[in-house]
Amino acid sequence: MIYISIGSNLGNRLLNIKKALNLLKNYGFTVLRQSIIFETQAILPANADKAWDKPYLNMVVQGKSILTPSKLLVKLKKIEKQLDRVNSYDKWYPRVIYLDILL
């Protein structure tokens, strides 16, 4: 079983999550169960840019894939790029989309 966390705190957050979920399915990920979509506050260090303080929409999907975890990770990064995620080396930076494999 594979669990993937999906979230967004920039732009049309709900649409971003729906697009990511559809792309995930297009890449051969079979969704067996999914959580509700819920909102959480951004967690930021005290010195973070105030413009980064935007709430996230999040969800988790449970499913299966014929891909190995490393190949699945490559596909997840491809989806993030397709949805215009800006790669920042600052882990606190807002995101159009993120997809993380949960262990």
Model-derived regions: residue spans:
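Core catalytic alpha/beta fold that binds nucleotide/phospho-ligands
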Residues: M1-L103
